[in-house]
Amino acid sequence: MSAQASPTLRVVPIHDVDLEQVSDLVNRAFATYEIFKGQRTSPLDYLEEAGEDARVILVEQEGRLIGTGMIARAERFTEPEQMGPAGTERPDVAAPLDADHPWAGALYFGLAGVEPEVMNRGIGRMIVSHVERLARAEGFPRVALGTLLEFGLVAYYEKLDYRTVHTAVYPPEHWSIIVEHSHFEMVKDV
């Protein structure tokens, strides 16, 4: 039996990727949580959510996509119901973020997924590490992300030195999720 090749990682502009393949992987990964009604995303929804200037992280092994994530300037993700530091009012989406806002100037990381059969083998950590290195290299002061408590990833990110800057509890049906869920906005200085 031959050894498997090590995974390779590359970052490409969103318009240079097969969004069908990427959104299918995200859907398989998110399906493991069993809290979504239907699919997490579609190619069109992925593009709309990520934005035209987003870049996509692709982790491949022997020609097969096994991990992915999306990065873009965090200011793009300033929807009033989505973000704001704990205990403060939400920013006006038309206004730029205050310089002291935790997501101001940050690189946002989201829409991440790992092929279920290779989960817990370091692929996600490989992606997060690359995002952090890329943020430093490109002059971003921090990385921002959002996760649900129900995914069990808050403690994981805390171990990687991310800190929670806002939490919100949403009712079932919000974001096509079938249960009440807690959204955590987190940042890490890089």
Regions found by a protein language model. Name each.
Residues M1-E20, D24, R28, K188-V190:
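Conserved N-terminal entry element of GNAT/NAT acetyltransferase domains
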Residues V114, N120-R133, K159:
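Conserved acetyl-CoA-binding loop-helix of GNAT-fold acetyltransferases
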Residues A31-T78:
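Active-site rim helix/loop that mediates acceptor-substrate recognition in acyltransferases
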Residues G124, V128, E150-L153, V169-I177:
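Short glycine/proline-centered loop/turn elements that form peptide/ligand docking sites
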Residues A106-L107, A135-L148:
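Conserved GNAT acetyl-CoA-binding A-motif
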